[in-house]
A protein has these predicted regions:
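Protein kinase glycine-rich loop
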Residues: 39-45, 50
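Conserved N-lobe loop of protein kinases adjacent to the ATP-binding glycine-rich P-loop
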Residues: 54-61, 67-71
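AlphaC helix of the eukaryotic protein kinase fold
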Residues: 77-106
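Activation-segment/catalytic-loop signature of the eukaryotic protein kinase fold
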Residues: 118
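Conserved short submotifs of the Hanks-type protein kinase catalytic core
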Residues: 122-136, 140
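Activation segment signature within eukaryotic-like protein kinase domains
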Residues: 156-157
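Protein kinase catalytic-loop region centered on the HRD/HxD motif
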Residues: 162-172
Length: 219
C-alpha cells in the first residue's frame, strides 16, 4: 500500500487538501511514540491516506495509513470498522497488509520505494516510506511532455522493467503499475510506488468490495 510519496505541498495546497480529507490525521500528529510527526496530508484513495512526515532526525518521510473508506471511519485518532462485519473485514485487511508490508520491506532496489518501518497504531497499519522528491509520470505526461524525450522514455522503461523483474524474482506482484504510480526524480530516475497490497487483501476479505479490480484497468 505504499502510495504516493509525492512532491511537497505549499501551505495553501495543504489547507485545501485537509478540507478534502476530513478523515485524515491533522498536522503535527505524532506516531510511534513521537518517532514520526505528520507535517501535511498528501493524498488519499479508497484504501489509504498518505502523509508527508518527519522522523526523529527531522528527515522527510512518507507515511501511508491503511484506511479503506468503505469499511472503516475515524473516531478521534482511532480507525474502526463501520459495522461489526466491517470490523472483522478491517481486522483481516490490517493483518494481511502488515504481512505484505514486511515482505516489501525486504526489497532493496534503486527503482522501488524503500520501506523504513511497518507498525500498528490507532487500530490500523502504517508504513514509513522513502520521501521521493519528484513528480509522478502522469503529471509529466500531462504538464511537461517535452521532458520525455525518446532517450528518457527508453531509460525509464528499462529501469521500471528491471524493478518489476526484481519483484517477480522475489515472488511479489506490484498489481497497480500505471503512470501515476511511477515517480520521476529531477535526474529522470523512475521509482515504483503504491503496491496496492491492501487492495489485493480486501478483494479476498470482503464480498462487498469484490467488484473492485485488483489490477488497475488499462494496465
Amino acid at each position: 500500500m505504499p502510495s504516493e510519496p509525492k512532491k511537497k505541498l505549499d501551505d495553501t495546497e495543504t489547507q485545501g487538501a485537509h478540507a478534502q480529507a476530513a478523515h485524515a490525521l491533522g498536522p503535527d500528529e505524532a506516531l510511534l511514540h513521537g518517532q514520526y510527526r505528520i507535517q501535511s496530508y498528501l493524498s488519499s484513495g479508497g484504501f489509504g491516506v498518505t502523509y508527508l512526515a518527519h522522523d526523529s532526525l527531522d528527515r522527510p518521510i512518507v507515511i501511508k495509513e491503511c484506511f479503506p473508506v468503505l469499511t472503516c471511519h475515524r473516531r478521534g485518532r482511532s480507525v474502526i470498522g463501520r459495522t461489526r462485519e466491517d470490523a472483522a473485514t478491517f481486522s483481516t485487511i490490517v493483518r494481511n497488509l502488515m504481512h505484505e508490508a514486511r515482505r516489501m520491506a525486504r526489497l532493496n532496489h534503486p527503482n522501488i520505494v524503500g520501506v523504513h518501518q511497518v507498525f500498528e497504531e490507532n487500530g490500523t497499519a502504517y508504513m514509513a516510506l522513502d520521501f521521493i522528491d519528484g513528480l509522478d509520470l502522469l503529471e509529466i505526461i500531462q504538464n511537461d511532455p517535452r521532458r520525455l524525450t525518446p532517450k528518457v522514455v527508453q531509460s525509464i522503461l528499462k529501469k521500471v522493467l528491471k524493478a518489476v523483474a526484481y519483484m517477480h524474482d522475489s515472488n511479489m506482484l506490484h498489481r497497480d503499475i500505471s503512470p501515476d504510480n511511477i515517480l520521476i526524480t529531477a535526474d529522470d530516475e523512475p521509482v515504483l510506488i503504491d503496491f496496492g497490497a491492501a487492495r489485493e487483501v480486501t478483494n479476498k476479505a470482503s464480498k462487498t468490495l469484490s467488484s473492485l479490480d485488483s489490477v488497475k484497468e488499462g494496465y
